[in-house]
Amino acid sequence: MRIEQTLNVTDAFTRTLVTFPSDGLTIYGFMDVPRGEGPFPVVLVLHGYVDPATYNTLTYTTRYADALARAGYLVIHPNFRNWPPSDNGPEEYRVGQAVDVLNLIGLVKKQGGQPGPLQQADPEHLGIWGHSMGGGISQRVITVSDGVDAAVLYGAMSGDEALNHQRILYFTNGVSGLWDEAPPDDVLQRISPINYLDRVTAAVSIHHGDQDATVPPAWSDDLCQRLQALAKPVECFSYPGQPHTFTGDGDQLFIQRVREFFDRELKAS
């Protein structure tokens, strides 16, 4: 990882623009490092879909990253490939973005606690937080990696790629989906994280607004029930009156619950 520039210094943390390599691509993002000696548990904050033409590194999820930094977490917020100024690269089924996260996890595990940008990172305590598209990417990550201790899924896309494809077609009036030509059903089943939940080792915290008109709340309900049936450590919350991105008191309650979840899973051990 490389620090490109300092973006902001607050009373609680320092925010820097960072880059890291991922399969030959350069991925940008920001990192919030709390004041103090550390080591600090690490949380990767994964943003939802924003039109790349209007995307800014300090996007809407910055407030969630900052709240975690103020609570004593070293937060890394990657832009993902194909979101500027990161390089462009393959992303079919959004596997490419999951690869970026997996490479970032590997980097934290290798460089955390060592001299350099991640010296204050605790590589043994790592969580991920994903909203919408980022929540879908998080599901893929926790089904293939045991390097994540805790995962927050917030208004998350489905682990069933057929459902995601249909939803994206709906939003784009049939212009685009996750693929141009539908893969065979057996391939679709193999690439869908929903079919590999038995591999999840992370504790999971699911949050969804019951007035979400973007991602159906039923998708989170289904995921919650599947994880419970597998006896996985999971907690599930529905937020009355809240849309896809929370506001007001519901947003503050969500931030509080996330902090308590990560404190329990990443700081107590």
Locations of regions flagged by a protein language model:
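Short beta-strand/loop motif that positions the catalytic acidic residue
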Residues: 200, 206-208, 212
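N-terminal cap/lid segment of alpha/beta-hydrolase-fold proteins
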Residues: 1-37
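Short glycine-enriched nucleophile-adjacent loop
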Residues: 106, 135-146
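Alpha/beta-hydrolase active-site loop
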Residues: 92-116
